[in-house]
């Protein structure tokens, strides 16, 4: 699928950001085990790519995926997909360090929903957040622990993240309207 709009990150730059996120996680947790949990949709391939980089330094990184559709407080933003309901997490999360992974952090509502969903599977000892892009505009007091790019944008601006696993290519684009951002 072709994407129009101003390109903010190239495929190579996205790969560099993912590697940097992985190394920041390793620096903060050199010996502590953690679980990377990708938020459905584009958080899942990001978590898998982070795990692949982390595996080079620390084999056995656990990953999971989390569908938050039923936990959202903005149902008009929820999109049902063929993967709806597909949450896969390793074992019980009780006492685990969980690192949530998503592509873009905006209002914080997705992350709030993800935290609510996680607690259905056990009470983690700690939850951290890794995002490819923080675009600002928070409505809830949520901040990333690991961030590839901070790109402050107004409400009238939209980002489109493309990942090769889902879209055939990597890229981050500033697009004109909300429909181009999905």
Task: Enumerate the predicted regions with their spans.
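PRPP-associated nucleotide enzymes
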Residues: 1-182
């Amino acid at each position: 699928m072709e994407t129009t709009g101003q390109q903010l990150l190239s495929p190579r730059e996205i790969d560099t950001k993912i590697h940097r996120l992985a190394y920041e996680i390793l620096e903060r947790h050199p010996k502590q085990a953690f679980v990377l949990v990708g938020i459905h949709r584009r958080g899942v391939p990001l978590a898998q790519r982070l795990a692949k980089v982390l595996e080079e330094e620390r084999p056995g990184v656990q990953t999971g995926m989390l569908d938050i559709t039923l936990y959202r407080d903005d149902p008009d933003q929820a999109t049902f997909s063929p993967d709806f309901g597909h949450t896969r997490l390793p074992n019980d999360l009780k006492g685990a360090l969980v690192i949530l992974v998503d592509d873009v952090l905006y209002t914080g509502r997705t992350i709030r929903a993800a935290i609510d969903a996680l607690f259905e599977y056990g009470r983690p000892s700690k939850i951290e957040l890794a995002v490819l892009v923080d675009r600002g505009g928070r409505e809830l007091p949520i901040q990333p622990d690991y961030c590839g790019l901070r790109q402050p944008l107004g409400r009238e601006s939209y980002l489109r993240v493309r990942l090769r696993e889902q879209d055939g290519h990597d890229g981050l684009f500033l697009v004109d309207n909300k429909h181009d951002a999905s």
